[in-house]
């Protein structure tokens, strides 16, 4: 539930996302939001309904709240594909709306995909987009240990900066003993691709 308050803390309205393929909201992840043009974009994580393999998997969850009437649209809660920004498991979610009004998200994935996933909508939320890996971690699909922490997303006039730390060992990392190096990556707005990331 998203609750709208006045600046003097009067409760004005609310929006509720029901069902949404969710058994546990915010499971094993974070929460981020961004506001632009009367829209509140929300990205978090959730544990999903039992799948055909008998398990409840975790993934990213995103939706848009229209602040004027508190309606919800563009809820992305189902198992999907990279063109929708889907990440599973998604252990951290960061998001911004860029100067051109495009939604940009950064997730820490361990399976689909396994790495720091940068996603940009082709326009406002709800439209398809492009997903690329800023960094990838060795290990089997879904191995929770990645040896990484994905912690920063910012926009420049010409691109996007992403920050993460990484042991370099992927699933073989010893999280309490291994040294983590800190990385800052740049992805060009005009070449939003693997080759446009350095």
Please tell me what each predicted stretch does.
Residues 1-198:
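Extracellular, repeat-based ectodomains that mediate carbohydrate processing or recognition
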């Amino acid at each position: 539930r998203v609750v709208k308050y006045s600046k003097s803390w009067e409760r004005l309205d609310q929006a509720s996302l029901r069902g949404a393929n969710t058994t546990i909201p915010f499971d094993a992840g974070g929460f981020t939001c961004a506001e632009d043009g009367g829209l509140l974009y929300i990205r978090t994580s959730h544990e999903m309904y039992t799948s055909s393999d008998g398990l409840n998997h975790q993934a990213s969850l995103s939706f848009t709240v229209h602040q004027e009437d508190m309606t919800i649209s563009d809820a992305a809660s189902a198992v999907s594909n990279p063109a929708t920004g889907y990440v599973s498991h998604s252990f951290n979610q960061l998001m911004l709306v860029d100067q051109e009004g495009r939604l940009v998200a950064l997730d820490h994935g361990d399976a689909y995909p396994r790495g720091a996933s940068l996603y940009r909508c082709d326009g406002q939320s709800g439209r398809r987009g492009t997903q690329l890996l800023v960094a990838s971690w060795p290990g089997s699909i879904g191995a929770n240990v990645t040896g990484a922490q994905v912690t920063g997303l910012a926009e420049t006039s010409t691109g996007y900066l992403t920050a993460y730390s990484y042991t370099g060992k992927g699933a073989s990392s010893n999280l309490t003993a291994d040294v983590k190096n800190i990385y800052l990556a740049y992805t060009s707005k005009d070449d939003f691709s693997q080759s446009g990331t350095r």
